[in-house]
UniProtKB/Swiss-Prot annotation:
Its main location: membrane. The gene is unc-31. GO terms for biological process: dense core granule exocytosis; exocytosis; protein transport; synaptic vesicle exocytosis. Residues 975-1106 form the MHD1 domain. CDD domains: PH_CADPS. Residues 441-558 form the C2 domain. This is Calcium-dependent secretion activator. Calcium-binding protein involved in exocytosis of vesicles filled with neurotransmitters and neuropeptides. Probably acts upstream of fusion in the biogenesis or maintenance of mature secretory vesicles. May specifically mediate the Ca(2+)-dependent exocytosis of large dense-core vesicles (DCVs) and other dense-core vesicles. Specifically required to activate the neuronal G-alpha pathway. Functions with G-alpha proteins from the same motor neurons to regulate locomotion. Involved in regulating entry into quiescence triggered by satiety. It is found in: Cytoplasmic vesicle membrane; Synapse. One of its GO terms (cellular component) is cytoplasmic vesicle membrane. Keywords: Calcium, Cytoplasmic vesicle, Exocytosis, Lipid-binding, Membrane, Metal-binding, Protein transport, Synapse, Transport. It comes from Caenorhabditis briggsae.
Amino acid sequence: MLGASSSEEEDDDFQDDHESQLPIAQVKKRSLLSGAMTPRSSSPAPSDSVSQTNSLKRNNSSSQARRKDSVHSQTPARSPMKMNSPSPMPQARTMSNVTRPVLQNSQELDGEEIEETEGSGTMVASDDGGPSLSKEEQERIKAEKEEEEHKKNLQMYVFIARCVAYPFNGQQTGDMARRQMKVNKPELARIRERFAQFLRGETNIAADEAFTKAIQSYTEVFLKSERVQKVVHAGGFSQHDFREVFRLIIEKRVRSLPDIEGLSKDTVLNSWLAKFDAIIKGDETDQNRNARGRSRNPNSAMSADAVLGKEQLYDVFQQILGVKKFEHQIIFNSLQLDNPDEQAAAIRREFATREEALKDPMKMKRLTPKFVVKDMETLYMDEVRMSINTLIGNLETVPVTTRGQTVGKRKDKSRSRSIEDLSLFNSLKRRTSSGSLNKGDSDDGDVTLTKSDVSLALSMEVVVMEVQGLKSIQPNKIVYCVMDVDGHKLATDHAEASKPKWDTQGDFTTKTPLPTVKVKLYTEVKSLVSFDDKELGKIMITPTPNCSRNPEWYTMTLPKNSQDSSLKIRIAIRIEKPPNLKYSGHCWCIGRNSWKKWKKRFFCLVQVSQYAFAVCSFREKKADPTEFIQLDGFTIDYMPESDPELSAQGGKHFFTAIKEGDELKFATDDENERHLWVQALYRATGQAYKPVPPKQSTIAPKAQGFQDKASKHGMDALIQADSINFDHDHLYSDIQRLTLDFRINEPICSLGWFSPGQAFVLEEYSARYMVRGCFRHVTLLSNLLDKADDGLLIDPALIHYSFAFCASHVHGNRCMPDRQGPEGVGTVTLEEKEKFQEIKERLRVLLEKQITNFRYCFPFGRPEGALKGTLGLLERVLMKDVVSPVPPEEVRAVIRKCLEDAALVNYTRICNEAKIEQRMGNDVSPAQRIEDMIRVTEFCIDLLKENEEHHGEAFSWFSDLLSDHSEIFWSLYSVDLDSALEVQPHDSWDSFPLFQMLNDFLLSEPNLKGGIFHNKLVQQFQPLVVRYIDLMEHSIAQAIDKGFLKEKWESRKEGCATSEDIYWKMDALHTFVIDLNWPEEDFRKYLQTKMKTLTSDLISKVSDCTFTAFDSWMQKAKKSTDYMLPSEVCVQINVMFSSKSRAVRVTVDSGEYKYQSKLDETLETMLKTMESCIQEKLLGVLESVLSRLARYDEGNPIGAILNIAPKPASIFNKLKTMAGDTSVQSSSSTRQPLTAQQSSGQIGNSYVTFFHGCTELLRQVIIDEIWVNGLFEHWYDNQMKAINDWLTERLQQSLSATQFISLSNIVKKVYQDFAMQGIDEERLNSKTYQSISRRLQLEESNSHIQEGIRRLKT
């Protein structure tokens, strides 16, 4: 063993060389396992007790051999060809591959061992440099190694089976964290397929669009993630983890949604989770298939983490150690694992052997391991004494049980006891020798038992069944029996004398082991003279606890005047032995101090406690023993020859009990009885020597048959091996390693934690065989680190616990001084310290690697709390000792270095995923380079968001370092960004979306806003933004100059083609500046001012050009009714309104108020001018019409001529008359008045047509209805005013027919059209309109009067 030193190393090496060549049964490794033992705690680790002291007896190999063994003991792979093994068994074959064994300075591998650890080929060189081994020899050697490995596993199983059969150091707890089923690769594939089916709509699960999107996001981000696949391969994900990740994702999504009245967000979450469960579980077919698959697994999740019974524990460790069923059965029978008395006796014998080893100082000095400090040897002896005393105390707490009864719960040390029990318990911590193991206990003296300590309480069942030979009474008489035990009487049922049978059981309790059972047979007597029933017979029986339980016939004693010749009764007596009665029977005995006369007596072996036994002799009907002795210090053995003098008086088969100052001789009449007595007393004394029956013995006990069967299979040496001859530290290490391998392969997401049953057995093994606590934990750490190196996921809390225990032990800061040496300092072996230093370095490297790859070791923050635990463990590993905390700067420096490396790892993986390096050649276009960078940017942003969402809480104490990590990450990104921007053309603006994406993300992160990368990004894009705005300004200005020169003023949306193009560009530029969301306030204000100025200038130019064009078009207007308002003018008005709507953005803020700019005032003035101009041109047409009508005034010569002048129709009619067409003439004369009327209204009709066309054009083309309504209102008012003024000028004269007809038509149509255009009736029916209407009505009346007068005259 590493660190075991001796002053006789040469002799030790010589002896080891010979021992390595002996068969396994003959190898007696001189080791005594001992250690400081503490009560079992609730820790899920194999043990949380303070350090277990290691074996007193170590392998005496040389220093070099110990170094070699140390190397192999620290790695799962041990040298298969090594012969100088520290274990009594040959070395185990390689169980796992270790790629890089970490060697300390004192640990070196010679050439032979290096060759062995590097793997084997088909040809192996021999040790003497001879020819290579043949394939047959290799197979033979391999078979031998496997056989030796199997024997070693069998030997370990023997010790494990003893621990399972009789645990006394703790209980199996069921309050450990319940582990979930882990998701394996096939299960992950099935889950992915189920979610794909849901997204394809192939399931019957109803879902809305929001839930479908959530499932789609979950599938793309989580289920299809390569990181999740790796962790599933590492056995670190359960379905619970899958559900928790989904819950976290949807919680954030649902909480961000607006509240819906009547539907709480918790209800939505629960509904979504229920649907998620339905998807992940699949349909009934999938569930049944999974259930069948799991039922075929013997270690299913339903029972793996439950509290296991003994048979289940046996089965588990049979699988772990590769033990076959028949081998287990042989071990079970040979060790009598179902006999708690035998198991307790075996434990007492183990303790006795250890105590004997402690009595030899020279031997102890030679076998003491090498410590880091020489003075620890004395402390080591004290630790061993304390450990044994602790084990003895633990054994004392186990209640006394009978054979076949399961060992119950440990007795509570604080339970109520009698004064005798308390004094007995407190003084019986050392029972196997007269002297105390602890010097402080030597003053207690011998323990004296009283008769009350050995009192017994037996339960009896007496069943009277039937009577034969009853002939003295009539058949119809009633008979019954009375049972009497120590004065307690019970009667049977009544029966007829013809059928005297009963099935009545009497239950009695007695304190004497030899009770007297009296049974009397009575018949009922119905007589006035006699009041007592008649006794027909009686029997008195003295049963023993060993009597047969089968019914027996007894001959009853008859009364003197009985007429029956023979009366027999059938009785069954069953006596339940109390737990403290281990054996009883009749023996001949003689002793020096007790039982001084050779006489046959009834003896009972009574167990008072686990270490106190007494042999008592009892008489009939007596509850107290006549004499008794305490078996403490006696040695039981067979007597090969009978004592002639004593055998002449009685007894055939002798055995003795010898003690210093006393000797007892016993004899039995039956040889089997003697064997049973010897075995019972042998278990009670706890002696190391096992009595061997004399050769002339003809009895073949059952145990001998089991031993013969074990010998037949070559297992007798393993079963009979003394545990003290084994190095249990290394055996435990192997068991722990194999158990961990088995646990990792279970379908449970254990993360390295043992199941309750496995932890319980390992705890019991380490306690019973006193495995050093530090060695246990340091080997567990080594095994866990090996698993972590293999890519499996291990809970850092488990590593943290074991590491903290080892650190406290190695640094000498123990917190339990009562269990250790003075001031809590315990012994530390050189091997423990070297292994701890090695583990500490390995653990530091592993933790730094995990923190560097935290996204891949703990994806999506799973397992829960693992990353936070890793950071805490790293801080513990960096501590120099357990008292002085590590400086925060040192911890931060390590974490900073890890996060710096993490930035490189994360960005490199993103680049590999996006294949960015492969797309940086000259064959890739600049636009494609920007697209690639946008895709990489999306990956980077998603990555940092995931870091904050899933890992931010773990880094809460190092949030600034996580921010630095992000800055470094972006600095790596900026290299590729610069490369992509350098190849962009001078006039390309494709990179602005990239800037907007980055800037928006950085602004949303308080830790990155205004950081190094953000400032660099701003400085990099600021010149591009300025140049882009300048170019856009120049481009828009040129578009204004060139566009309006060629503008055709056709309607386009809100304006013309040129204005729409210009304003689209201006709006796009404005949106671009807003979307930039520039982070620097100064430049942001500059951009805002720049955009206001640019907008104002551009609008001014557009409005000026439009107004100029409007003026030119209006100058072409005519006053004739043939003139129609051009649509181009309406389009120009639309352009002005479009300009006005955009001019609203150009405002000047002054406190809480906003004032319109000069541009608004200018545009408003232009619109008013344009309205006035249009009205002026339209009114000019009306004025022209009124001027034409003025020519028809009365007294106006021109008007008279116009009134007399024939119309074209009348001239045509006259030509027809001249031709002689009288019919036509008469017809024309009848229609002439109507034709004249139409001719008179021609002027009015032409104006109405002009008016109607203009109103429809204005309403359809101009977009601002309010402005159009205002124009119509003013136009209407002006028209009515003009007509009214014209009529007012002619108040003194009547209107001609032409004037009347034209004005009536104009007024009527104008009123109707403006009413249809939406002008208020109140405005239409103005006073002016009413005045016009009255005048026209008056003129109409005058016209009718004059027409009537003309008709009268004619």
